[in-house]
């Protein structure tokens, strides 16, 4: 919300270049950010929240990483994995226990907020959290404040929170309350890329790796390296983009003789 128009244009350029595919989402995201900046300034929209659904490896986490990079963060991405918060007392671990109890010095959520230098939080595996943890975010998204167990308030007005989940559309409606669903600014399903899109991704990723290698390691690379890597990667074998990316990296390392 603090970016001027030129900085916002630069933000979107870096964001678009950092996130491959998902063109429809990118357009929706630009509209969301534009509206958010307006209504945040007049005090009507505290937090921009995205709830991204889909199988593992389809690019949900990459959205948060792309935002993180585009904002120019100098710290690591602030991430809380809700897979660790499924027990009945999980909320205490997240926001700290009351005074006198173990963990009363704080909680992971507050620690991650304090670590972030760009106002961005990734909440991973949202569907695995205990109901008390899920319900806690009703107030966070509504009021733009994180409150610990000792009633200390932390202002997160202007933050972006990206929630990711492997949940299906059907289970989303049955497992997430209408009250919480209505508080998410964007709710979307990320699908697996087609083989055609995956081939385009391989070209994109290999060019990206070669560019970085030349910048940070050496200008000296084998002739025809790009095409050789592309030829060795059979995209039909990989549904998960994470596995496809690993194959690209392994092939690159093999062909440069590292």
Residues of each region from the PLM?
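AAA+/P-loop NTPase substrate/partner-engagement loops
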Residues: 70-101
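The Walker A (P-loop) glycine that initiates the GxxxxGKT/S ATP-binding motif of P-loop NTPases
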Residues: 54, 124-125
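Canonical AAA+ ATPase core
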Residues: 65, 99-104, 125-136, 141-199, ...
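Hydrophobic positions in the central parallel beta-sheet of the AAA+
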Residues: 80, 121-122
